From Swiss-Prot:
GO terms for cellular component: azurophil granule lumen; extracellular region. This is NHL repeat-containing protein 3. InterPro entries: 6-blade_b-propeller_TolB-like, NHL_repeat. Residues 1-25 form the signal peptide. GO terms for biological process: proteasome-mediated ubiquitin-dependent protein catabolic process; protein polyubiquitination. It is found in: Secreted. Keywords: Glycoprotein, Repeat, Secreted, Signal. The gene is NHLRC3.
C-alpha cells in the first residue's frame, strides 16, 4: 500500500513539473501530452436570460406567481407585502408597463386567459382579509370582472362554492376552468368548472390513495386531454381525463426528495417542466405519449442557488420561455429554450 501511494505522489509531482516547465520554458512536452478523460454529453435545454426584466427594482415584495399572455406579449407577476402593488405587468422583453392592487389581498396563483376579444387574468387569493379565499378574474388593467367563492370567508361548500387557500388554476381555450383548492387549508380538491361556472366534476378527499390529495398545488393540461396535478404533500403528480375526471395514474418515482410545486408543459408537448420548491430545482421531464402515462423520466435539471425557492412557473406558449416566480430570491427569472450540448465529466 505504501508503494502505491509513493507511485501516486511521484506521478503527481511529474505532472506538476511538466506544467511548470511548459509554462516557464516553452516546452512542447505538455502540448503533445494526451490526457485520457472519460466524457459524457449533458443536454442543456435552457439558458438564463440575464437581461430580464429590464427593471428588477419593481420587485418590492415576495414574488409568488407568474403568468404569460402569449397572445399579447404580456407577463403578469403576483407579489406579496405591505403597502406595495400586488400585480406587476411587464412585456415579454422585460419592460415594465404598470402595476395594480385592486381587490387583491394575498395572491398565490395567477393565469392569463386572453382571447382575440378580451385580455384577462385570473388570480387565486389566499388572504384572510375581505378579498381572500377567492378565485377572481380581472382585466389586464386590474378591473374586477368575476369572483368565485365567498370573499373573506373560507369554507368547504359546493353550493354556494367556497374555497380555502385555493392554490392555482388553469383555464382552457374553451373557457372551462380547473382549480386546485387546498394549499394547507380545509380542502384538498380538484374542481372542474364550465365556462358558466357550473361544477362538471371534482375529486375532493384528503389522503394518499388514487384521486386523493395532500396539498394539490398546481394544475395543467396536455394536448392529449389529460389533467396533471402537482400533489405536493404526497410527492407525486396525478393525472386525470379532462372530460370525465377519471383517474389515469400517478408519477411517484421522480419526486421522493421533495414534492412538485408547479407543473407546465412546453408548447410542443415534449416536456413537462416541474418546480420543486425546497430543493430550488427545475426538472425537465419527458412527456408520455397518448395512452398510458408510464413512468416519470427526468431529461434535464436546472439547479438554482440555495434558498431561491421556485414556487410557481409558467411557459410561454409561443416562444417556450420559462418564467419562474422565486419566493426566496424575491424575483421572477426567465429561461430561454436552447438546444445545445456541453461536455461534462462522468463515467
Amino acid at each position: 500500500m505504501a508503494r502505491f501511494w509513493v507511485c501516486v505522489a511521484g506521478a503527481g509531482f511529474f505532472l506538476a513539473f511538466l506544467v511548470l516547465h511548459s509554462r516557464f520554458c516553452g516546452s512542447p512536452v505538455l502540448r503533445n501530452f494526451t490526457f485520457a478523460v472519460s466524457w459524457r454529453t449533458e443536454k442543456i435545454l435552457y439558458r438564463l436570460d440575464v437581461g430580464w426584466p429590464k427593471h428588477p427594482e419593481y420587485f418590492t415584495g415576495t414574488t409568488f406567481c407568474v403568468a404569460v399572455d402569449s397572445l399579447n406579449g404580456l407577463v403578469y407577476i403576483g407579489q406579496r407585502g405591505d403597502n406595495i402593488p400586488k400585480i406587476l405587468v411587464f412585456t415579454e422583453d422585460g419592460y415594465f408597463l404598470r402595476a395594480w392592487n385592486y381587490t387583491v389581498d394575498t395572491p398565490h396563483g395567477i393565469f392569463a386567459a386572453s382571447t382575440l376579444y378580451e385580455q384577462s387574468v385570473w388570480i387565486t387569493d389566499v388572504g384572510s382579509g375581505f378579498f381572500g379565499h377567492t378565485v377572481k378574474k380581472y382585466s389586464s388593467f386590474g378591473d374586477l370582472v368575476q369572483v368565485l367563492g365567498t370573499p373573506g370567508k373560507k369554507g368547504t361548500s359546493l353550493n354556494p362554492l367556497q374555497f380555502d387557500n385555493p392554490a392555482e388554476l388553469y383555464v382552457e381555450d374553451t373557457g372551462d376552468i380547473y382549480i386546485v383548492d387546498g394549499d394547507g387549508g380545509l380542502n384538498n380538491r380538484l374542481i372542474k368548472l364550465s365556462q358558466d361556472f357550473m361544477i362538471l366534476w371534482l375529486h375532493g378527499e384528503n389522503g394518499t390513495g388514487p384521486a386523493k390529495f395532500n396539498i394539490p398545488h398546481s394544475v395543467t393540461l396536455d394536448s392529449a386531454g389529460r389533467v396533471w396535478v402537482a400533489d405536493r404533500g404526497n410527492k407525486r403528480i396525478q393525472v386525470f381525463d379532462k372530460d370525465t375526471g377519471e383517474w389515469l395514474g400517478a408519477w411517484n418515482n421522480c419526486f421522493t426528495e421533495e414534492g412538485p410545486s408547479s407543473v407546465r408543459f412546453t408548447p410542443d408537448g415534449k416536456y413537462l417542466i416541474v418546480a420543486q420548491l425546497n430543493l430550488s430545482r427545475l426538472s425537465v421531464v419527458a412527456a408520455p405519449p397518448v395512452g398510458s402515462i408510464g413512468e416519470c423520466s427526468v431529461i434535464s435539471t436546472i439547479q438554482l442557488a440555495d434558498q431561491v425557492l421556485p414556487h410557481l412557473l409558467e411557459v410561454d406558449r409561443k416562444t417556450g420561455a420559462v418564467y419562474v416566480a422565486e419566493i426566496g430570491a424575491k424575483q421572477v427569472q426567465k429561461y430561454v429554450p436552447l438546444n445545445s450540448y456541453v461536455p461534462s465529466f462522468g463515467s
